[in-house]
């Protein structure tokens, strides 16, 4: 940075440090550089400016330029030569500057300020560069002999640290230059540099007391030693530190012909390559050559020198324990000196590499399309029912894993809920048999809680699309959730009559699976699969239910259902209460169109009860079951299964899924609000807000609306302005007369 110092023999004074980008005015009153007791100094005598472009901030061979401009009456002299008034001149370090004709003499000097930083983050480097730029200094990326300071937040053993210690340069914190800049701006003394020494943060040093100040012993620490490098990367990294310490760095290649006595000569230190380092790429022949040199050293009782010993020898200022081939290796040395630092190499090499192969075998469900998306034949379904409890739970878990794996995974909780729903939809045969659900024999509280959760689970978003929705767009998700709800409600009533269901199951196993398995989604998926691939063999006629027995089975199922409802009245009271709380809104909003259109199958079959509460609960239960059975009956008689094609199976049931959510109907029913007085129009309607000028033309001001403005003359203001002008003219005349009195020209030529 530039400084303006009083010349020898002149009046003593403090040096002026000049910041970059600031104009310093030299004068005798109200200026940056004040010179008093000199009548030849003008008020604005000269201007000093330091210009420092940002582009050359990292170029250590360029220094900022200092220019001076003369604005005085009696002149400014540079090296005893008078400057021309109004022109600028570039100053060099050591130039003598005289302001006026008396003893106001100064000299300018440039104090080098080249800063090198190490282990600083991006924000720290930005703040440091701004402070160095204002101080007129330079920044360097690599350490050179011109560097004056090393900036580190914490001392680590790096190449820059070793070079700074050898060159005797101070290692300081980045906050030092911020405080130095504030002191220059306020014209105070610079801060003490010793109070800005950073702490030592290096595991290789530990808690030992280390003197990091500039010591002369470090400049000749490697004098008389020759460091032999067997790797070019090591030579490039450490050769500068060896050269600064007075030693010689030599790079040896495989082609060089040197006698074996050269490596064992006194003062020769062979730097250990570190073949185990994964960052080094060494060929097989080079490894063989390195092993040959190491064997030579071992035969002579010598050892290779690790990289880190070069830095430790500089820090502790000794070569007896470090960098000594004849000495014992340091046991406390655990790391090598890396390029950036000891700590940074750990993070650079910290790649996770497994030492041994780990058994990562994972058992998942079969993900082939046909076993996952299709179903088993109806004759094989009873074998699946007879799975024990443990295998059944593991099978459910594997199906849940398979569903979650294909899902986009919005959250773990949502995936679990959705996977349970998908498992229930895929294997609905578990829902109607009491032998497949031993969990239903628990207490009533758990049963009601399970029913409440099952109702809630139908409104969770599904994370995986079903193939049957893509193949058959006629089946909607609303129908599926509605059908699943009816099945789950029937599931809650099964512990009352296990013997009835068992006898019913034995009767239906002679021909095919029971009626409940036919109403599951498996049957629907079989029909859709056969429709999709006609070349598949149709099911044998022995497994199909005859048409004449359809009505008999329906009547039998109605009787079984009535027996279950009579035997489970206490449980229904608890279950319907929970059902009423959770599904009251959705059931109340559901249209009654399906129930009115279809013939009810079990209406009026139950006996009347004395309690009004049980009647309401039974009506709600019958309504849900009526819709589910009427849906089955309607789908069974639908035209979709009466296809004339011989390839498709006939006399089967198609499962249709119903939803508790009401679909959007015509808009007229929504716009009408039913009241006691009749239908009223919906009052929650909004109309567009009108904007200015929408209905008529805007009102334009003009013509007679404009009134002319006549300015009146203010005589008092004019008189005051005239008086001020006269006062200013009088003051100017007085100042010119005063300047004429102080004019002195000793070189006036007389005629």
UniProtKB/Swiss-Prot annotation:
Superkingdom of origin: Eukaryota
Chain spans, region Interaction with MTOR, MAPKAP1 and RICTOR: 221-403
PTM sites of type Phosphothreonine: 337
Cross-link named Glycyl lysine isopeptide (Lys-Gly) (interchain with G-Cter in SUMO2), sites: 569, 580
Region (Disordered): 389-418, 444-479, 491-550, 576-645, 731-751
Post-translational note: Ubiquitinated at Lys-436 via 'Lys-6'-linked ubiquitin chains by RNF8, promoting NBN recruitment to DNA double-strand breaks (DSBs). Ubiquitinated at Lys-684 and Lys-688 via 'Lys-63'-linked ubiquitin chains by PELI1: ubiquitination takes place following PELI1 phosphorylation and promotes ATM activation and DNA repair. Ubiquitinated at Lys-733 via 'Lys-63'-linked ubiquitin chains by the SCF(SKP2) complex: ubiquitination takes place following SKP2 phosphorylation and promotes ATM activation and DNA repair.
One GO BP annotation of this record: mitotic G2/M transition checkpoint
Example of a GO cellular component annotation carried by this entry: replication fork
Motif FxF/Y motif location, chain numbering: 738-747
A molecular function GO annotation: DNA-binding transcription factor binding
Phenotypic effect of disruption: Early embryonic lethality. Lethality in utero is associated with poorly developed embryonic and extraembryonic tissues.
Composition bias type Basic and acidic residues, residue spans: 502-518, 528-539, 577-599, 615-636, 731-742
Tissue: High expression in the liver, heart and testis. Low expression in all other tissues analyzed. In the cerebellum the postmitotic Purkinje cells are marked specifically.
Domain remark from Swiss-Prot or TrEMBL: The FHA and BRCT domains specifically recognize and bind phosphorylated proteins.
Name of the featured protein: Nibrin
Native organism: Mus musculus
